[in-house]
């Protein structure tokens, strides 16, 4: 009952919050201008931008240059961190390959962590590298999505200014909400301090070091920005990051807030005036929510069913291996599905200990990579499936392939197919390399089907820019650091470039008349068609390898 109430409340909150995002996205005046405008102007002066409207090509260039500069600075800081200040625990520099992986991971909003948060980063790099990139990577994804939506919806004839979009989103959305969430988490017991690790004497007389630090400030943007990288190695399974059931709901709600609001924002932009949400966006929302609930149901059923091997021994009950007692199987399964659907990657239980079908659910969500998804890019990925569905359905019934009165031609379809293929190609090719390259497979700690699942999950998480993992995998090696770094880099930037190209290409040949020979995209059957095509296309791509992994493991457990 508490899960139903929570999900219902989040739908209502995101619907209302999308109205505020609408004013932020379209640079409309609001009551908070007096508070934020001066700070924004100061940021614009520091950046040196004159807020001129950019072409699509210029927008992408600045997006890539901004991200490239941040990535370089991050890499340098990680390989020299031991000689910098705010290092009371005397942590050492990261190796070149680990720093490469870490920098790309946080730059691309993935937060895949091959390092140990307690010993491999300092307080300085936690704050000015990890936390900073959590803000900017999230805002970058939002900015390119808003640029795409402005062109597709035809609300304006401009794409906008990259620096204006990113600064407004950080100042008006991320910073205020992060401060609020940090305070809420601190009230629940999440620490925020710059003191060195606690050193205590245990009952047995031994000395134990307890790691903590500025956790609350990172924890807030970690979930709000769908980042996922934990301050501690145990992530949100540790009491310092996620002390109780209330902090658990705060973190889950933070993950869902902005991606769900973005879909409603799209609907408000389609309705022109922003006071209501267009039916097309509502159809998309219901379709994605249906897939979300279906995967959640499968995961919860599997986790509550428990391990059949233990049942044969007379031990019944839910699967509690790798789970925190304070959350139980239900809230652990909900957190797992939310963190993979919204591509956050934080965990409040160990995914490597999930039942086979319990692990299948989050893996499928990352393979689909469209069920709400991360900040901005999730909606962009969904729109690729929407365009693909419109094109196929139109040809099947002999109608003109058009989306929002824009004809979909051969040029757009080539880009759409490329975007669709990048994701599975990266996952499948690099998974195969993990078994072929000498030494790479030595990181696998489980035999047979589960070992394949470990590899598939790691590569899928990197390709989906998620960051969670089956942490039984010993992934801090040169192969895994470099390979997943390359995957995260390619899967983030190539689709974004192609998606903006698609939007610009469609707008450049826009027809402003309503063609009666096009399919209706605001009817329930379009939502059903979208679900069918998502399942069919992804199923045909990934079912063979899933049979070798979680499905095969499920069939062998008796």
Curated annotation (Swiss-Prot):
One example GO MF annotation: potassium ion binding
Gene label: kdpA
Location(s) in or outside the cell: Cell membrane
Signal sequence, renumbered to the chain: none
Protein name (Swiss-Prot/TrEMBL): Potassium-transporting ATPase potassium-binding subunit
Function: Part of the high-affinity ATP-driven potassium transport (or Kdp) system, which catalyzes the hydrolysis of ATP coupled with the electrogenic transport of potassium into the cytoplasm. This subunit binds the extracellular potassium ions and delivers the ions to the membrane domain of KdpB through an intramembrane tunnel.
Positions of transmembrane segments: 1-21, 66-86, 127-147, 166-186, 245-265, 281-301, 327-347, 354-374, 377-397, 416-436, 482-502, 531-551
Keyword vocabulary terms for this entry: Cell membrane, Ion transport, Membrane, Potassium, Potassium transport, Transmembrane, Transmembrane helix, Transport
């Amino acid at each position: 009952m508490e899960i139903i109430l929570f999900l219902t409340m989040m739908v209502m909150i995101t619907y209302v919050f999308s109205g505020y995002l609408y004013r932020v996205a379209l640079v409309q005046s609001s009551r908070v201008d007096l508070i934020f405008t001066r700070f924004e102007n100061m940021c614009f002066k520091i950046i040196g931008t004159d807020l001129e409207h950019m072409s699509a090509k210029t927008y992408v260039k600045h997006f890539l240059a901004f991200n490239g500069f941040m990535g370089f600075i991050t890499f340098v800081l990680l390989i020299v961190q031991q000689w910098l200040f705010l290092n009371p625990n005397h942590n050492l520099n990261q190796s070149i390959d680990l720093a490469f992986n870490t920098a790309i991971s946080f730059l691309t909003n993935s937060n895949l962590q091959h390092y140990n948060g307690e010993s491999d980063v300092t307080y300085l790099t936690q704050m000015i590298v990890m936390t900073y990139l959590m803000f900017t990577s999230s805002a970058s994804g939002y900015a390119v999505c808003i640029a795409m939506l402005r062109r597709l919806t035809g609300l304006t004839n401009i794409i906008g200014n990259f620096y204006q979009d990113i600064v407004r989103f950080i100042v008006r959305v991320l910073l205020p909400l992060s401060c609020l969430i940090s305070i809420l988490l601190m009230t629940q017991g999440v620490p925020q301090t710059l003191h060195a690790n606690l050193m205590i004497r245990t009952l047995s007389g031994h000395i134990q070091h307890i790691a903590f630090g500025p956790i609350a400030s990172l924890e807030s943007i970690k979930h709000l920005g769908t980042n996922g990288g934990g301050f501690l190695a145990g992530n949100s399974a540790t009491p310092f990051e996620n002390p109780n059931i209330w902090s658990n709901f705060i973190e889950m709600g933070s993950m869902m807030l902005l991606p769900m609001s973005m879909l409603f924002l799209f609907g408000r932009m389609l309705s022109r005036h922003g006071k209501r949400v267009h039916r097309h966006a509502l159809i998309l929302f219901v379709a994605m929510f249906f897939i979300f609930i279906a995967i959640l149901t499968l995961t919860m059923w599997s986790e509550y069913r428990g391990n059949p091997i233990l049942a044969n021994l007379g031990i019944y009950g839910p699967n509690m291996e790798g789970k925190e007692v304070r959350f139980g199987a239900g809230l652990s399964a909900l957190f797992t599905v939310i963190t993979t659907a919204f591509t956050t990657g934080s965990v409040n239980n160990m995914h490597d200990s999930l039942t086979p079908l319990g692990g299948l659910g989050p893996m499928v969500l990352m393979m689909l990579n469209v069920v709400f998804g991360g900040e901005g890019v999730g909606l962009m990925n969904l729109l690729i499936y929407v365009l693909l569905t419109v094109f196929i359905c139109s040809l099947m019934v002999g109608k003109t392939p058009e989306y929002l009165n824009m004809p979909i031609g051969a040029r757009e379809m080539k880009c759409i197919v490329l975007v669709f293929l990048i994701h599975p190609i990266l996952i499948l090719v690099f998974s195969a390399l993990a078994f072929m390259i000498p030494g790479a497979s030595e990181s696998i700690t489980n035999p047979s089907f589960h070992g394949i699942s470990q590899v598939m999950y790691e590569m899928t998480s990197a390709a989906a820019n998620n960051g969670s993992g089956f942490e039984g995998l010993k992934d801090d090696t040169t192969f895994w650091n470099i390979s997943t770094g390359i995957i995260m880099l390619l899967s983030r930037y190539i689709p974004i470039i192609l998606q903006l190209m698609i939007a610009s290409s469609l707008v450049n040949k826009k027809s402003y008349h309503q063609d009666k020979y096009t399919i209706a995209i605001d009817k329930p059957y379009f939502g059903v068609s979208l679900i069918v095509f998502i399942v069919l296309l992804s199923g045909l791509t990934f079912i063979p390898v899933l049979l070798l992994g979680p499905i095969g493991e499920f069939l062998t457990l008796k």
